Design a protein with these regions (language model features):
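ATP-dependent carboxylate activation and anion-phosphoryl transfer catalytic cores
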Residues: 1-140
C-alpha cells in the first residue's frame, strides 16, 4: 500500500530492453545456421555446435548510397568476398535493400565465429561501401 495515496494501482507497460536492436538479425542467424541459444551459457551455437556472433544494424545510411541498386550492392560484396557462406557459416546478410537506391539506407547483419570476426566483417562492409560510393564525388 502507498501511504500517500492509498492502495497501489498497477499499470502494465512495455519496456524494450533488447541490446541487439531488432529481432531480425537473431532470426536470420537462427535460420541460416539452424542453431539456437545454449540455455546454460547464453551463447548462440550453430546446428554444427560452433559458437556464432553477430553485429547488426537496421539503419546503415548515407547520401552516397542513393542510386546504388541492389544488384550493385551484391556485386560489391561478392567481389569483396563478404557474402554469407553456408560452408563457413560466416559472412554478411543484407535486408531492407528496397530502401537503398531511393533513400540510401539498408540493414546489415555480419555473422562470424568470434566477436572480432563479426566486427571485422561489419567494418569491411562499411569500408567497401565508402570506397565504392565515393568515386567521382567531391568531399562535402
Amino acid at each position: 500500500q502507498n501511504a500517500r495515496r492509498g492502495p497501489w494501482h498497477l499499470a502494465g507497460i512495455e519496456i524494450n530492453l533488447r541490446m541487439g536492436g531488432t529481432t531480425h538479425p537473431f532470426l536470420a542467424l537462427r535460420f541460416l545456421t539452424g542453431g539456437q541459444l545454449d540455455p546454460t551459457s547464453g551463447l548462440f551455437k550453430s546446428q554444427g555446435g560452433r559458437l556464432k556472433y553477430y553485429r547488426a544494424t537496421d539503419n546503415l545510411r548515407s547520401p552516397r548510397y542513393r542510386g546504388l541498386l541492389p544488384e550493385d550492392l551484391f556485386d560489391l560484396v561478392t567481389v569483396n568476398k563478404l557474402l554469407y557462406s553456408e560452408r563457413t557459416e560466416c559472412g554478411v546478410l543484407f535486408h531492407m535493400i528496397g530502401a537503398l537506391s531511393e533513400f540510401g539506407k539498408l540493414g546489415v547483419t555480419a555473422i562470424g565465429n568470434s566477436v572480432e570476426e563479426a566486427d571485422r566483417l561489419y567494418d569491411r562492409v562499411l569500408e567497401v561501401l565508402e570506397i565504392e560510393t565515393g568515386y567521382g564525388r567531391a568531399d562535402d
